[in-house]
Amino acid sequence: GIHPYIDRIINEVHKLTEKGFIHDEHIKAEKYQYMDELVTTINEYNDILALWIKMKQGSLSLNIETFGLNELFDLIRKGSRAFEMKQQQLEVTPTDTYVKADKALTLFMINTLAENARKYTPKGGKVKVYANPTEEYVEISVEDTGYGLSEEDVTRIVGEKLYNSQEIGILDAADREELLKNKGSGFGLMNCKGIIEKYRKTNEVFRVCLFNVESTLGKGSRFYFRLPKSE
C-alpha cells in the first residue's frame, strides 16, 4: 500500500526540521528530490489501482501513437534517487528506437518493472533498463541482480490472470520477513499483462506484443515486453 511511502515522507520532513538539515542547501535539495519521488510513487500506486479497475470493467482505451523510447528512458533515469537509497546502480541504456503504442501505458509498464526490480534486489545490486530492436518489434527489458524466481513462480506470473502476490517467492526466500515487507498488491504486473492482451486484441499490427519473464533463483530476473517497431 501507500502507507510506507507516507511514513518515509514524514521521516524526511522530521530530518529537515528536527536535525537542522533545513539550513543545508545541498542536503535540503536532496531531501526535496527524494520526497518528490515518494509522492510520485504514491500517485503511481493510485494509477495502478485505477488502471486495474478500468481493465476489469473493460473500459480501458488505448491512445496509439508513434514515439521514441528514449524520451521515456530519460524519465526512468530521473527516478534514480530511490535506487541510490538502496545503494543500487540503475543503468538505463540510451536508445534511438521508435515504437507504435500508448505512450502513457508504456511508461507505466517500464516504471512498474523497474520499481519491482528495485524492491526485490538487495543492496549493492544492479537494475538495467534497455531496448533491443528487431525488424518487427522492440523488446524492452528490465533486468536485475535480485533474488530471482522459481520456475513455478514464473509460470504463475506469466500464465495466471489473477494470483496471490504474497505467495510469489515466499518458499525460496532466504529472508521471508524482508520479502513480505516489500510485497505489493501484485496488480502492477497483472496490469502489464492486461495491457499486452489489450494490444493483441486491437489489430494485426500488435500481434508481436508479448509479456514474459526469465529468472534464475539467486541470480536475478529479466522482465520484458514487446511492442511494434516504428520508423
Q: What is the predicted role of each segment?
A:
Residues A117-R118:
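Short helix-loop "hinge" at the ATP-lid/N-box region of the Bergerat-fold HATPase_c
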Residues L69, G148-G159:
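Short helix N-cap motif at coil->helix boundaries in the Bergerat
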Residues G124-E136:
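Short beta-strand/loop element within the Bergerat-fold HATPase_c
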Residues Y34-Y45:
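Short alpha-helical segment of the dimerization/phosphotransfer core of two-component systems
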Residues D144:
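Acidic ATP/Mg2+-coordinating residue in the GHKL
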Residues A82-V92:
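Short conserved segments within the C-terminal catalytic ATPase subdomain
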